[in-house]
Amino acid sequence: HRLTVSGIDIPLLAVTGSNGKTTSKEMLASILAAAYGDAVLATRGNLNNDIGLPLTLLGLGSEHQAAIVEMGMNHPGEIAYLAGIARPNVALVTNALRAHLEGMGSVEAIAREKGTIFEGLSEDGTAVFCADDPWVGLWQSQVGMRRTLCFSFSGQAPLVGAYRAHGLESWLALQYAGESIEVALALPGEHNARNALGAAGVALAAGISLADVAAGLSAFKGVKGRLQRHAGFGGAVVLDDTYNANPDSVRAAIDVLAATVGNKVL
């Protein structure tokens, strides 16, 4: 049996990608909370498969003003199936990297599968992805005639970000439609700034103000096991990145550690 979401007149946002799905989804949930308060439905944890997604959507009620769902995959056809169920208004692909190669065979196959989320968009939906990504041409072809809202750190997109860091402190400046704002981020690393910029793009495509985007990103406190900061003994700082890993996410975590000052232990 197949559940298809229809007749829902609220923003229904979706996120997929090799890395950063859950972090981006939680950032978006925080942004939506800034705009809509408690009237937001979001995927719990990473319940992002063919069981978790329908369970999340079955929780939609008349009290909700927006929803954000996460979609994961480990074999061909899974994202297309999930997108066909949700029919989101706005969809984000965070990236396509070396994850689930055992089921997909190549990064190109992963990128193509991730991009099928755009084919499941509603007719007036918007695709969001990074204009700096090597798979931008592939994803643009999968979007077809639907709208896009690309983001970039190089300035070649409607939404432009600038990242700066000092030790484990980081900030993201956003420029969009003649407005600009800077926010402090709870998570270190340029990859997390990219997650935040993508989440901002989804929110802006859904009609949320840049002020609410900034408020939501500022309120975001991080996700368990994903570069969470803890106090250690003797003034040490422990970065917990133990949730899950693939080669690219491990490298991103090592890059964060390498950029810090003082003695370091991996």
State where each predicted segment sits.
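Thr-Gly-centered strand-to-loop micro-motif
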Residues: 42-44, 69-70, 186, 200, ...
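Active-site beta-alpha connecting loops in nucleotide-dependent enzymes
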Residues: 223-225, 242-266
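Acidic, Mg2+-coordinating active-site environments of NTP-dependent enzymes
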Residues: 10, 90-237, 262
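Conserved cofactor-binding/catalytic machinery of classical short-chain dehydrogenase/reductase
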Residues: 24, 198, 249
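Buried hydrophobic packing segments
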Residues: 28, 32, 56-57, 196-206, ...
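Phosphate-binding loop of NTP-binding sites
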Residues: 1-131, 135-144, 259-261
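Residue-level recognition of specific faces of alpha-helices
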Residues: 56, 70, 216-219, 226-229, ...
